[in-house]
Amino acid sequence: MTLVLTIGKIADSGLRRILELTFSSIIVTKSAGVSGAMDLAHGRPHRVNSKTPRNTIQQSERKLRQYLLYFSKQDVGKAAGVMAQPVMGDARALPLNNDVVDLIVTSPPYANAIDYMRAHKYSLVWLECSTAELSRKRATYIGAERIAVQGGPILPESSERTIPAPTELDSTRARILRRYFSEIAQSISEMFRVLRSGRAAVLVVGTSTMRGLDV
């Protein structure tokens, strides 16, 4: 608590964000975190009484040193005329012009594997995000369960054949799956729009099952 309160008092917004990133990264981990929980990163948290939480200050210092090393390497890229610039946006409506991207490397969210907001909330609540705000954000995630799809792009036949199958078992899950496919289609359409002709898009996708069905 002392650490996060101290970070919140830092006036320099850039420094504060780096420290918030550091703090978040030592909470949401698979196993080597500073709490008694396991598998926070995969959204399946459970307490393990035999686990000894790691020292918060030591872990923060270790992570911060890693980040400072990464940031120092930006000078190498700058000297070569190459700089990374993070841009916040929505994959379904990219804030980019047509034909401006040379390479896309991404791993889309899974249809039924990880509850991303459930994983994120353990650090976001510490960083003073309210549960109401988290709920609003969750509703905007790709494939979110709260909002039904209205319209959306026409799906490939293979996707349409997959969707009715879960309906007999769970109509709610079928609607969630339709929304997921619809929004992934929007994302892929945006990738096609911004990618230059002849350039590559690499999508890493693993197996996902819903009610025992491969989707």
Regions found by a protein language model. Give the residues of each.
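SAM-dependent nucleic-acid methyltransferase catalytic core
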Residues: 2-105, 111-117
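SAM-dependent methyltransferase catalytic-core segment centered on the flexible catalytic loop
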Residues: 110-190
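Acceptor-substrate binding/catalytic loop of class I
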Residues: 173-182, 204-215
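A generic secondary-structure signal
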Residues: 6, 190-191
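Short glycine-centered segments of the SAM/dcSAM-binding site in methyltransferase folds
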Residues: 18, 199-200
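Helix-to-beta-strand junctions that scaffold the AdoMet/dcAdoMet cofactor pocket
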Residues: 194-197
